[in-house]
């Protein structure tokens, strides 16, 4: 039997270099990915290396608040 409520949540990952560049107005946009994570296994904020089409390279994408 399953215990508790929803352990898996949908999160949004945002490019960290695009968000820093958007302050200086260098990048045309901000890359965002959606994924799911298990809150029990990864209680901290998730950071993954993903491809950013605005930076044209693989960068670190961090979890953001909704």
UniProtKB/Swiss-Prot annotation:
Stored InterPro entries: Ribosomal_bL33, Ribosomal_bL33_CS, Ribosomal_bL33_sf, Ribosomal_zn-bd
Record keywords, A-Z: Chloroplast, Plastid, Ribonucleoprotein, Ribosomal protein
Keyword Ribonucleoprotein: yes
Subcellular location: Plastid, Chloroplast
A GO CC term attached to the entry: chloroplast
GO process terms (BP): translation
GO molecular function, one term: structural constituent of ribosome
Family: Belongs to the bacterial ribosomal protein bL33 family.
HAMAP family per record: Ribosomal_bL33
Protein name: Large ribosomal subunit protein bL33c
